[in-house]
Amino acid sequence: MRESAHTNTSLWSKGMMAVTSAQFLSAFGDNALLFATLALLKAEFYPDWSQPILQMVFVGAYILFAPFVGQVADSFPKGRVMMFANSLKLLGAASICFGFNPFIGYTLVGIGAAAYSPAKYGILGELTTGDKLVKANGLMESSTIAAILLGSVAGGVLADWHVLAALGICAVVYAGAVVANLFIPTLPVARPGQSWRFTPMTSSFFNACRVLWRDGETRFSLIGTSMFWGAGVTLRFLLVLWVPTALGITDNATPTYLNAMVAVGIVVGAGAAAKLVTLETVRRCMPAGILIGVGVLFFSLQHALLPAYGLLILIGILGGFFIVPLNALLQERGKHTVGAGNAIAVQNLGENTAMLLMLGLYSLAVKAGLPVVGIGVGFGALFALAITGLWIWQRRR
């Protein structure tokens, strides 16, 4: 089924609702499956060091397939690419459920996620236009964060009840995402006729990297989003060590609740950005980025639970307000230069590389015996300074 003129600019069109529903189910499955698979590793007495390997193979798939997934998203109707990617996730979850090696199964999920990302964001620019693209990004980010919240909690609760049942429910959720993809209109291919030989494909990707990096606005967006997501993943791990040190609470639930506060804040911030920021006023988001670092600094010095909750909600609001306009800017500029799919693939490479780099630096700091509170203060200060530098550079440009 094709929509006339290829786009329906309404945020509540059938196509947008199908994309948002598929994204919610897919992200819900990703987060529920992570905690269900971690429970499986514990139940089968895998060593503790094996648990972070799950996240590593997931992120590694993004980096390994970065040169290819953007072209896939731009060479086929994006709704069908999303359906194929969710089918890979379904296969990975089902294989874990039926007793196959969980790392191999989770790698399949990671490959599916890598293929899914350029298509899910790239299709927004084909279903909406102009300033509605910012609002569409806000809707997508809000749906994603809600899925992260609910999926994480559901994965843990279901795994405590029955690990295999939790894995099976994850597979059913992915199946629901596949069905939702069927309702996305078949849109025209963005960049038909590209070569599928290895060398031209990699050359095309790295050419897209060069084109986006040489453009001041897209370089600005790439750096900003990469720093944000690298910092977000690092903060998640920082909380695990910070809670017992700063609050004297040793349970496993409290860090999860604190992470949830950040996610709630991001939903609010994403909604505010959709209403207050346009593609012409993207720089309005930069003070929020600086204040994220300041918020982390003050949060690290807290010794009571209530102000910690409040500061993390505030950090989340600032984060949502910061990331949504930068995503929209990259999609809009990328669509007219290298294709939206290639632009998002380049963005994924930057973000996941930043995640690995920041987590590596954090791990080195912990291994060196630096106090967790000091790490948090330094991390917040460095992030604020980095975003300030990015803002100054952009203003001078």
Curated annotation (Swiss-Prot):
Belongs to the major facilitator superfamily. LplT (TC 2.A.1.42) family. The keyword Plastid does not apply. CDD domains: MFS_MefA_like (cd06173). HAMAP family: MFS_LplT. It is a multi-pass membrane protein. SUPFAM superfamilies: MFS general substrate transporter. The chain crosses the membrane at residues 21-41, 53-73, 91-111, 139-159, 164-184, 229-249, 257-277, 281-301, 304-324, 344-364, 372-392. It is found in: Cell inner membrane. Gene3D superfamilies: MFS general substrate transporter like domains (1.20.1250.20). Catalyzes the facilitated diffusion of 2-acyl-glycero-3-phosphoethanolamine (2-acyl-GPE) into the cell. The keyword Transmembrane helix applies. One of its GO terms (cellular component) is plasma membrane. InterPro entries: LysoPLipid__transptr_LplT (IPR023727), MFS (IPR011701), MFS_trans_sf (IPR036259). Signal peptide: none annotated. This is Lysophospholipid transporter LplT. Keywords: Cell inner membrane, Cell membrane, Lipid transport, Membrane, Transmembrane, Transmembrane helix, Transport.
